[in-house]
Amino acid sequence: MRILYCASEANPFCGSGGLADVAGSLPHTLCRKGQDCRIVVPLYGTIPQELKNSMNFITNFTVPVAWRHQYCGLFWARWNDCTYYFIDNEYYFKRGTLYGHYDDAERFAFFSRAILEMLPYIDFHPDIIHCNDWQTALVPVYYYLFYSHRPWYYNIKSLFTIHNIQYQGEYCLLYTSPSPRDS
């Protein structure tokens, strides 16, 4: 089975709690069991330089965010027999902390959309996209609205796991509205 595991944090690259522990271990267990499980996380500025040195550039593209398109760099690395992908945008992710910013809704709306945009660039058609917590909750929504009708994206299923119900990512609807180009 081909699984894309989407999380806002994953050990050893970036973490602030239990999600990082799960995202850093569950995909590796699935890989050891013979599944093609790949992980995607933001390329935060807080990732240690020695881990950044192991990353390889794939490409860059733009991601629709509300009324504009934002730069997205895409990197990959192997760690413990799993492939990691890193979504790069310094405006959104080169900060001193993972969360707690005024624009977290926009940052993770961008991340969710970038996950879907990156798939053809890595030539990976997952059977399942496993989303974790509010930071990736828009992936299934964006898939249904903007990608499910495109032949390359047919038949991708999604799974959503809540790790901590206390953090719900409640923000203004403005950040989830489609751009005029998407309507």
Regions found by a protein language model. Name each.
Residues E117-P120, H125, H163-Y171:
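A short, histidine- and acid-enriched strand-loop-helix "catalytic/donor-clamping" loop
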Residues N132-T136:
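Short His-centered aromatic/hydrophobic patch
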Residues Y175-S183:
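Single conserved hydrophobic/aromatic residue that forms the stacking wall/gate
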Residues Y154-I156:
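A short helix->loop->beta-strand "cap" motif at the edges of active sites that frequently abuts
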